[in-house]
Amino acid sequence: MVRYEHDGSVTIIADSYNGKRLNSPNDIVAHPDGSYWFTDPPYGGQLYEGAPDAAGGPSNAAGRLKPRLGQPPEIGNMKRELPNSVYRADPSGKLDLVIGQDQIPNPNGLAFSPDYKKLYVISTGRGPGDAHAGGNRDMHVFDVAGNN
Protein backbone atom coordinates (compact mmCIF):
# COMPACT_ATOMS: atom_id res chain seq x y z
CA MET A 1 0.00 0.00 0.00
CA VAL A 2 1.50 3.31 -1.05
CA ARG A 3 0.77 7.01 -0.73
CA TYR A 4 1.56 9.47 -3.52
CA GLU A 5 2.97 12.70 -2.11
CA HIS A 6 2.35 16.19 -3.50
CA ASP A 7 5.92 16.35 -4.82
CA GLY A 8 5.35 13.16 -6.87
CA SER A 9 7.30 10.85 -4.61
CA VAL A 10 5.83 7.59 -3.35
CA THR A 11 5.77 6.52 0.30
CA ILE A 12 5.29 2.85 1.15
CA ILE A 13 2.78 2.61 3.98
CA ALA A 14 2.72 -1.18 4.23
CA ASP A 15 4.03 -4.05 2.13
CA SER A 16 4.18 -6.96 4.56
CA TYR A 17 2.57 -8.46 7.65
CA ASN A 18 4.69 -10.36 10.17
CA GLY A 19 7.51 -10.52 7.63
CA LYS A 20 5.35 -11.96 4.84
CA ARG A 21 4.55 -10.15 1.60
CA LEU A 22 1.02 -8.77 1.24
CA ASN A 23 -0.90 -10.30 -1.68
CA SER A 24 -2.45 -7.33 -3.48
CA PRO A 25 -4.06 -4.75 -1.18
CA ASN A 26 -7.48 -3.84 -2.51
CA ASP A 27 -10.72 -2.11 -1.49
CA ILE A 28 -9.19 0.45 0.85
CA VAL A 29 -11.29 2.68 3.14
CA ALA A 30 -10.10 5.54 5.35
CA HIS A 31 -11.15 5.94 8.98
CA PRO A 32 -11.30 9.35 10.76
CA ASP A 33 -8.63 8.17 13.24
CA GLY A 34 -6.10 8.30 10.36
CA SER A 35 -6.01 4.55 9.75
CA TYR A 36 -6.64 2.73 6.48
CA TRP A 37 -8.53 -0.56 6.34
CA PHE A 38 -8.14 -2.84 3.32
CA THR A 39 -8.72 -6.31 1.98
CA ASP A 40 -5.74 -8.32 0.75
CA PRO A 41 -6.99 -10.82 -1.86
CA PRO A 42 -4.70 -12.66 -4.30
CA TYR A 43 -5.81 -10.87 -7.47
CA GLY A 44 -2.43 -9.20 -8.02
CA GLY A 45 -0.81 -12.62 -7.71
CA GLN A 46 -1.31 -13.31 -11.39
CA LEU A 47 1.25 -12.65 -14.08
CA TYR A 48 -1.05 -10.46 -16.18
CA GLU A 49 -1.32 -8.13 -13.16
CA GLY A 50 2.44 -8.00 -12.72
CA ALA A 51 3.07 -10.29 -9.74
CA PRO A 52 2.74 -13.97 -10.59
CA ASP A 53 1.96 -16.66 -8.07
CA ALA A 54 4.20 -19.56 -9.09
CA ALA A 55 2.76 -22.84 -10.25
CA GLY A 56 1.37 -24.67 -7.25
CA GLY A 57 0.86 -21.45 -5.26
CA PRO A 58 -2.53 -20.78 -3.62
CA SER A 59 -3.63 -18.46 -6.45
CA ASN A 60 -2.23 -20.54 -9.27
CA ALA A 61 -2.55 -24.26 -8.59
CA ALA A 62 -2.55 -25.07 -12.32
CA GLY A 63 0.50 -22.90 -13.04
CA ARG A 64 -1.16 -20.75 -15.71
CA LEU A 65 -0.38 -17.24 -16.93
CA LYS A 66 -3.96 -16.30 -16.11
CA PRO A 67 -5.08 -19.18 -13.86
CA ARG A 68 -8.66 -19.29 -15.09
CA LEU A 69 -7.83 -19.31 -18.80
CA GLY A 70 -4.24 -18.92 -19.81
CA GLN A 71 -1.01 -20.51 -20.68
CA PRO A 72 1.86 -21.72 -18.49
CA PRO A 73 4.02 -18.80 -17.30
CA GLU A 74 7.66 -18.60 -18.25
CA ILE A 75 8.82 -16.42 -15.33
CA GLY A 76 8.42 -16.02 -11.59
CA ASN A 77 8.60 -18.47 -8.72
CA MET A 78 7.18 -16.49 -5.80
CA LYS A 79 4.23 -18.13 -4.07
CA ARG A 80 1.58 -16.30 -2.09
CA GLU A 81 2.48 -16.17 1.61
CA LEU A 82 -0.68 -14.89 3.31
CA PRO A 83 -4.34 -15.92 3.22
CA ASN A 84 -7.03 -13.45 2.16
CA SER A 85 -7.57 -11.09 5.09
CA VAL A 86 -8.65 -7.61 6.18
CA TYR A 87 -5.99 -5.36 7.72
CA ARG A 88 -5.83 -2.00 9.46
CA ALA A 89 -2.81 0.24 8.89
CA ASP A 90 -2.42 2.91 11.56
CA PRO A 91 -0.93 6.31 10.62
CA SER A 92 2.60 5.04 11.36
CA GLY A 93 2.14 2.07 8.98
CA LYS A 94 1.81 -0.60 11.68
CA LEU A 95 -0.53 -3.35 10.45
CA ASP A 96 -3.11 -5.21 12.48
CA LEU A 97 -4.91 -8.28 11.19
CA VAL A 98 -8.58 -7.40 11.70
CA ILE A 99 -10.44 -10.24 9.95
CA GLY A 100 -8.90 -13.50 8.79
CA GLN A 101 -9.85 -15.94 6.04
CA ASP A 102 -11.19 -18.24 8.78
CA GLN A 103 -13.76 -15.59 9.77
CA ILE A 104 -14.81 -14.59 6.25
CA PRO A 105 -13.85 -16.69 3.25
CA ASN A 106 -12.46 -14.47 0.48
CA PRO A 107 -13.05 -11.01 1.98
CA ASN A 108 -13.28 -8.52 -0.87
CA GLY A 109 -15.15 -5.25 -0.67
CA LEU A 110 -15.57 -3.23 2.50
CA ALA A 111 -17.18 -0.02 3.76
CA PHE A 112 -17.82 1.77 7.03
CA SER A 113 -21.22 2.82 8.28
CA PRO A 114 -21.74 6.63 8.25
CA ASP A 115 -20.83 6.83 11.97
CA TYR A 116 -17.76 4.54 11.51
CA LYS A 117 -19.01 2.17 14.22
CA LYS A 118 -19.63 -0.73 11.81
CA LEU A 119 -17.47 -2.33 9.13
CA TYR A 120 -19.21 -4.14 6.29
CA VAL A 121 -17.23 -6.82 4.43
CA ILE A 122 -18.35 -8.90 1.45
CA SER A 123 -17.33 -12.54 1.00
CA THR A 124 -16.61 -13.05 -2.70
CA GLY A 125 -18.01 -16.19 -4.25
CA ARG A 126 -16.18 -18.68 -6.40
CA GLY A 127 -15.51 -17.47 -9.93
CA PRO A 128 -15.50 -19.48 -13.16
CA GLY A 129 -12.44 -21.72 -13.27
CA ASP A 130 -11.50 -21.17 -9.62
CA ALA A 131 -10.08 -24.30 -8.00
CA HIS A 132 -10.93 -23.23 -4.43
CA ALA A 133 -14.36 -23.19 -2.82
CA GLY A 134 -14.67 -19.41 -2.77
CA GLY A 135 -16.65 -17.30 -0.34
CA ASN A 136 -20.32 -17.43 0.49
CA ARG A 137 -21.29 -14.10 -1.18
CA ASP A 138 -22.67 -12.77 2.11
CA MET A 139 -22.24 -9.33 3.63
CA HIS A 140 -20.75 -9.51 7.12
CA VAL A 141 -21.05 -6.71 9.69
CA PHE A 142 -18.52 -6.08 12.47
CA ASP A 143 -18.45 -3.59 15.33
CA VAL A 144 -15.48 -1.23 15.14
CA ALA A 145 -13.71 -0.50 18.42
CA GLY A 146 -10.24 1.03 18.46
CA ASN A 147 -7.95 -0.83 16.10
CA ASN A 148 -10.23 -3.83 15.54
Question: Predicted regions span which residues?
Answer:
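Sequence-structural signature of mature extracellular/luminal beta-sheet repeat domains
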Residues: 1-148
